[in-house]
């Protein structure tokens, strides 16, 4: 994170206005502006583990990664700068949580790209901190208001669930495929055969649907699940618990916190980071898998058919095969052999 995002560049146009402010940064924090912004004091709260990794190097204990912010995260802050994400329910969850903790009279700034739907912040906060647009540049909008009324926030009210093949899937705002099983994951699930054994790592686990489905017909698997998203980690834990399944679930930036080797790695890797298309996560997943697969271990991923994963798979493992496909998606399989580039 060296270059600033367009949203941060818009904020920097107003940097003189924040010199005396005690700021909490939250939302989609895709650069290190919170660590470098000139103000009286700065804190940050994020639900994204990879954002916490970057910011914690410079901000230390003044940045926290968790599902929900606590009173200690907003201590002494008089200003919120919220970076609008592309997911509206995620924004509502985070804003209701944080504004329920901020003192009345706090300044509230919301900034984001126009295409992300940042304009809907006006309606969302109308009853709590009526917003006015104060700048428009770099295809972004910057809005300001003052907190007039603290919203009520209860985490329990934000949980949702759906059922698939007798399994209960627990979800939260910001979790991939929150409202039901996505087509890509469904295709990957169709390739997982009963009686699978050994250690299985589910990277980018989301709500835990892949692992739950696998364990339901392969009770001898030993599951490990990880995701960069705090809501995903908590949703996966809840999904396993709801179905009487066991597994280790933790936050990790792809393999950053993963230890040991596995007999199978499964994933429906993301190819967006915020509003931007990015293959970085999938490339890190494929190239890093060789350090986390046992000999003969298998990597199985699903991806949009147009993405250039075959080239990366062949460069890393020496071969790949397509074991299922539709018009939009393909499931790729490769195996850890001596020719894989460790």
Swiss-Prot record:
This is Ribosomal RNA small subunit methyltransferase C. Its main location: cytoplasm. The keyword rRNA processing applies. It is found in: Cytoplasm. CDD domains: AdoMet_MTases (cd02440). It comes from the Bacteria. The gene is rsmC. GO terms for molecular function: 16S rRNA (guanine(1207)-N(2))-methyltransferase activity; nucleic acid binding. One of its GO terms (cellular component) is cytoplasm. It comes from Salmonella newport (strain SL254).
